Amino acid sequence: MTAPTIPGAEPFSHIGSSDAGVLVLHGFTGNPGSMRGLAEACAAAGFHVELPQLAGHGTAMEDMIPTRWADWSGDADKAYQVLAKRASKIVVMGLSMGGALTLWMAAEHPEAKGIVCINPATQPQPVEVLN
């Protein structure tokens, strides 16, 4: 069962005036409200914008418990597809888990024109792997 969305945690969508779009992704235990200011700034600059409410977020903690990466990445990809219908150039940006999703989206969608990762939640790698 899904609880009602907390006021201010609603997804955000904007039809812009350019051929560029921005997909904005919030972090784990967060909701679209935490990234709304950034999304609205992109919209004010004329970009198409999608800021989805990731599965299990923005409602009640009980809704988050059964959700997994596949749910969140699926939500991100659906939002990307919606944005791609309006924008030929897409930049993906995200905070924390949204930053990790942004990295995943870049691998899944190499046609994306850019990424912005804000404190991405990633697994640290040993120095040998990085060399």
Predicted regions and their residues:
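Short, hinge-like loop/turn segments at secondary-structure boundaries
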Residues: T67-A70, P110, N131
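Active-site nucleophile loop of the alpha/beta-hydrolase fold
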Residues: V116-V127
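Short, surface-exposed "cap/lid" segments of acyl-processing enzymes
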Residues: A3-A60
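Catalytic nucleophile-loop/oxyanion-hole region of alpha/beta-hydrolase
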Residues: A60-V91
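Short phosphate-binding/catalytic loops that engage adenosine nucleotides
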Residues: F47, S88, P110
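Active-site signature of alpha/beta-hydrolase-fold catalytic machinery across serine-
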Residues: W104-E108
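Gly/Ala-rich beta-loop-alpha elbow adjacent to hydrolase catalytic centers
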Residues: G94-G98, T102
